[in-house]
């Protein structure tokens, strides 16, 4: 029991929570709970990418039904596909990586300064929200030069194409308790 607590303390010291393996940078609260729910409801990747389950829908009604049901069923998987596309976009754009480093570096410096003492400019105490807005203002030219706007729209477009294609062409999972649909004769 003591060894298990020591391992958990070591993991927390490394920046990971022993129970969830989520980074400590994600504050506890609604964001962490949402991410934990997504991880808990993720569907098996083997069924998500099974090529034998892809087929062309017969008609528009089946296409719409597939879209709705697959987006609902694979919602957590689609969130991680979206996060993967964001990661791919950031890693393949060195200038965007530099802009993000400048922004997060400025935020980290401001965070360390607020731990030491309050920031005072022209005799007035500057709130943390204004400090982070200043960091964003300083980083804005870097984001503009890196083409962050086009990167955002690329990620959104790629996400819609990938998720829309998967949801439209992946056959619907059989759900327990689903009513049998009878065709009119």
From Swiss-Prot:
The chain crosses the membrane at residues 79-94, 95-112, 132-148, 149-165. Ubiquitous. Strongest expression found in placenta, pituitary gland, kidney, lung and stomach. The keyword Membrane applies. Residues 165-185 are annotated as: Required for interaction with GDI1. The keyword Transmembrane helix applies. It is a multi-pass membrane protein. GO terms for molecular function: GTPase binding; identical protein binding; proline-rich region binding. InterPro entries: Prenylated_rab_accept_PRA1. Pfam families: PRA1. GO terms for cellular component: glutamatergic synapse; Golgi apparatus; membrane; plasma membrane; synaptic vesicle. Keywords: Cell membrane, Cytoplasm, Cytoplasmic vesicle, Golgi apparatus, Membrane, Synapse, Transmembrane, Transmembrane helix. Residues 1-78, 113-131, 166-185 are cytoplasmic. PANTHER family: PRENYLATED RAB ACCEPTOR 1-RELATED (PTHR19317), PRENYLATED RAB ACCEPTOR PROTEIN 1 (PTHR19317:SF0). Belongs to the PRA1 family. Homodimer. Interacts with VAMP2 (synaptobrevin-2), GDI1, and PCLO. Interacts specifically with prenylated Rab proteins; strongly with RAB4B, RAB5A and RAB5C, and weakly with RAB4A, RAB6, RAB7A, RAB17 and RAB22. Interacts with NDRG1. General Rab protein regulator required for vesicle formation from the Golgi complex. May control vesicle docking and fusion by mediating the action of Rab GTPases to the SNARE complexes. In addition it inhibits the removal of Rab GTPases from the membrane by GDI. This is Prenylated Rab acceptor protein 1.
